[in-house]
Amino acid sequence: AIESLMDELAEKLDMEPMVLREKNAAVEGTQRPNGTKVGVTGNEAVMRAVVESPHYRSELAGPWRGRGVALGFWGANSGVHAVNATVNNDGRVILTTGAVDIGGLRAVEAQVMAEVLGIAYDEVTPRYGDTDGIGYSGLTAGSGTGSGISASVMHAAEQIRDRMTERAAAIWGVDVKDVNYDSKTGVMSTTVGEARSMTFKELAGRQQATGGYISGHVDLGGATGAATYGGHIVDVEVDPETGKTTILR
């Protein structure tokens, strides 16, 4: 409806519709009706791609034919999600989140945690939390929950990885920067002094006696809202007797 109104306004102003759109395009820093400002945006880039396309520049001959252009965006806001993750003595990671699983979300969470830490997928146990045990988590809907919860899980996993690295350094008596954490195998190693290595599971079994249990906690994650833009160009032909509209291109 907005795009139809833009075309009507362009007609009243006797202006090319795409020129009107370009003159009024929202750009980075534009104030939005809700009080926030537009961040990085592909709005103008999409407009340029439309007007520079061979389709837009081609001739459309013949009666009862017309060309329509419409632009649109989708707010890809993935929300905020709280995550708690704890390393057990047996090397398993207990992952507690607040987003409801309606189709594979826990599998995604476990995959992200396992990939960052270099442990097996089945060594991560995803669980639901509630308002007594976990921070705020957005609703599960649309296309944003997976990316939003993945960002939170990734940051929690990185906290665990860093703390495991620090613990290994303390056990070996070396500087943290001298410990390498292999995210493909979950093995920590150092070549300072005597070459030594330790698996994620081995260190997990020693955590209580070497400084306490290791965990990760994230309140928000790193996925922020942004809009994705797109444009369509369509050529149609209308039958004046029946009103049937045929898409030509």
Label each region the model flagged:
Residues 11-13, 17-117, 129-249:
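Cofactor-centric catalytic regions
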Residues 119-121:
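Proline-centric
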